[in-house]
Amino acid sequence: MTKTIKEINRLLEAISELSDPYFIELESDDRVGVKKAVNKRRKAIQAMVDEELRLDKMLSYEKVLYQEGFSLIAGIDEVGRGPLAGPVVAACVILPIDCKIKGLNDSKKIPKSKHLSIFQAIQERALGIGIGIVDNHVIDDINIYQATKVAMIEAIKNIKGDVTEPDYLLIDAMTLETPIPQQSIIKGDANSMSIAAASIVAKVTRDRLMMDYEKAFPGYDFAKNAGYGTTSHLNGLKQFGVTPIHRTSFEPIKSML
């Protein structure tokens, strides 16, 4: 008896390999609906294969370190170097060996709608997470580059969880003054699972802070622009002036004082 397209779709959903013989069996079915269902499932499986390969590639730095005997590898990244207002936030995340988190990538490449679910997945699976926050006053005193380093060191010191002391650091494009062995990786948030996890944690943490600042200082659209120099933010500056969380060493704030 010929199966309905609905029945075929149900069977296709159970297939997870492109080499499954059921695909060959369906090639003789000329129904347009069947061909669409087959193509859709093949694309879905290929997407899963591609994602698995991408995640494997993102573990390449970690795998080298596993082979060298390191197991408590912390990824470190920051968010908030460029905004005109608010702190710079760093995160330090220690993931279990060979941990893969679906969808994890550089936070700038992930749709904002998915940030929270990936953040929650990191919280559930991480062995330890630390946060470092350096406010705008310190940024103005020592410059954003040095403030970023301070935030990263604070994140390491503040690790909480089952593991609080990493044995190796993978850092996004920075070198830190710490006795812990480390490696600086250019575009690390796109090439290391551990750094990408830190990127998301730092991003979600800072976004939440900026949403709180939106309530304290309405009119600058902080909840949406996170302190970056958007049109709405610049309009707020013209209308309401500089707030206590603005970076006075950054233009155009500096010229407004």
Curated annotation (Swiss-Prot):
Q: Which NCBIfam families match?
A: PRK00015.1-1, PRK00015.1-3
Which cysteine residues pair off into disulfide bonds? none
Q: Which PROSITE patterns match?
A: RNASE_H_2
Q: What class of enzyme is it?
A: hydrolase
GO cellular component, as recorded: cytoplasm; ribonuclease H2 complex
This enzyme's EC code(s):
3.1.26.4
Alphabetized, the UniProt keywords read:
Cytoplasm, Endonuclease, Hydrolase, Manganese, Metal-binding, Nuclease
**Where is this protein localized, as stated in its record?**
Cytoplasm
Record-given protein name: Ribonuclease HII
Catalysed reaction equations from the record = Endonucleolytic cleavage to 5'-phosphomonoester
- Which residues are in the RNase H type-2 domain? 71-257
Which family would the database say this protein is a member of? Belongs to the RNase HII family.
Which organism does this sequence originate in?
A: Streptococcus uberis (strain ATCC BAA-854 / 0140J)
Instruction: Relay the cofactor remark from the entry.
Output: Manganese or magnesium. Binds 1 divalent metal ion per monomer in the absence of substrate. May bind a second metal ion after substrate binding.
Which GO biological-process labels does this protein carry? DNA replication, removal of RNA primer; mismatch repair
